[in-house]
Amino acid sequence: YSFRAGQFARLGMELEPGAAPVIRGYSIASAPEAPTLEFFITAVKDGQLSPKITALEPGQSVLLDGPAEGSLTPDRIPGGSTLWLLATGSGLSPFASMLRSEAFWAAWKDVVLVLSVRQIEEAVLARELVAALPLERRPKLIVTTTRETDPARFGDLTGRIPTLIASGALEAAAERQITPEESRVLLCGN
């Protein structure tokens, strides 16, 4: 399956025998050169498809519909010295694909990955992702929590990304400035 880092694929399942499959777009989390496709999918409580996909067992099938789509790809970003990847929740997926990609690291050396989650447990995938990367390819990871009330469970920061940018707290935590001349910023999530 051919795709560029940052793109999404349309996955589907036939939920009732003989019915048309229900299809949704999910960002690909694996690198383009990986032998398998990986997705970070959050089961939406009353969702039509995501609970079914996340309940699949090994060996069960899912429909992969059509070619990969999407324009949140690093080849569309003009050069700069620092790339900021700002994600909320499963918006981490396209950035995981980029960070795992050989071609991505040929273009970017200084990367800041910011993940905003409700509770700190939701940051496990990001921490595992960064830890699995070679040392020379690890972005600066900043986790911010929005619904933790116990200070012992806060992330690196607490609050929503726009508020942290406006206050200067995000730049302080990253030890870098966001400037139009040198920074490029990608956003993904809700």
PLM segments and residue spans:
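Reductase modules of NAD(P)H-dependent flavoproteins
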Residues: V114, Q119-G189
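Ferredoxin-reductase
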Residues: Y1-Q60, T146-R147
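Conserved S-adenosyl-L-methionine
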Residues: G80, A103-V111
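Conserved beta-strand elements of the Class I
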Residues: L83-L86, L186
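Short helix-loop-beta connector
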Residues: R76-T82, T179-E181
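Ser/Thr-glycine-rich phosphate-binding loops at phosphate-binding pockets of nucleotides
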Residues: T88-S93
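A short, basic/flexible loop-to-alpha-helix module at the beginning of a structural domain
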Residues: A68-P78
